[in-house]
């Protein structure tokens, strides 16, 4: 089981969605959660350090989730950070693009708490967390 003190960054331009994900994480025992409203905001926070997991939307202003993912993977200090994409983009080509860019997992909105928990556990297991 993953460390319950693991620090999450939830990235979504829609504040209600950030709150939903934060509350679901809280239900799963993860209380160390911060938020960012787009990829640029997220990048600034991530570069300050201390985060152990990113949950990001795809469609956002300034820097979308795919660009954020590519930037994280290209940065030596952050390249191993797990990134779960949570998005309304359900098209096969989007899922493939996210996988090719290095997404740790992919969840299509709307989703249940059970789906989020299952994806997180798969990522934790794969990373030995």
UniProtKB/Swiss-Prot annotation:
Phosphorylated by CheA or acetylated by acetyl-CoA synthetase, depending on which acetate metabolism pathway is available. The modification 4-aspartylphosphate is found at residue 57. GO terms for biological process: archaeal or bacterial-type flagellum-dependent cell motility; chemotaxis; phosphorelay signal transduction system. Its main location: cytoplasm. The modification N6-acetyllysine is found at residues 92, 109. The keyword rRNA-binding does not apply. Mg(2+) binds at residues 12-13, 57, 59. GO terms for cellular component: cytoplasm. PROSITE patterns: RESPONSE_REGULATORY. Residues 7-124 form the Response regulatory domain. InterPro entries: CheY-like_superfamily, Sig_transdc_resp-reg_receiver, ST_Response_Regulator. It is found in: Cytoplasm. Pfam families: Response_reg. Keywords: Acetylation, Chemotaxis, Cytoplasm, Flagellar rotation, Magnesium, Metal-binding, Phosphoprotein, Two-component regulatory system. SMART domains: REC. Involved in the transmission of sensory signals from the chemoreceptors to the flagellar motors. In its active (phosphorylated or acetylated) form, CheY exhibits enhanced binding to a switch component, FliM, at the flagellar motor which induces a change from counterclockwise to clockwise flagellar rotation. This is Chemotaxis protein CheY. The gene is cheY.
């Amino acid at each position: 089981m993953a460390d319950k003190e693991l620090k999450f960054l939830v990235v979504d331009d829609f504040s209600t969605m950030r709150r939903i994900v934060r509350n679901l994480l809280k239900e799963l025992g993860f209380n160390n959660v911060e938020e960012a409203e787009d990829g640029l905001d997220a990048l600034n926070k991530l570069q300050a350090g201390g985060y152990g997991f990113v949950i990001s939307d795809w469609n956002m202003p300034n820097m979308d989730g795919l660009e954020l993912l590519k930037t994280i993977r290209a940065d030596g200090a952050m390249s191993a950070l797990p990134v779960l994409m949570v998005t309304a983009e359900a098209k096969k080509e989007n899922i493939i693009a996210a996988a090719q860019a290095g997404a740790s997992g992919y969840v299509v909105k709307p989703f249940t708490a059970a789906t989020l928990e299952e994806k997180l556990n798969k990522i934790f297991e794969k990373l030995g967390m």
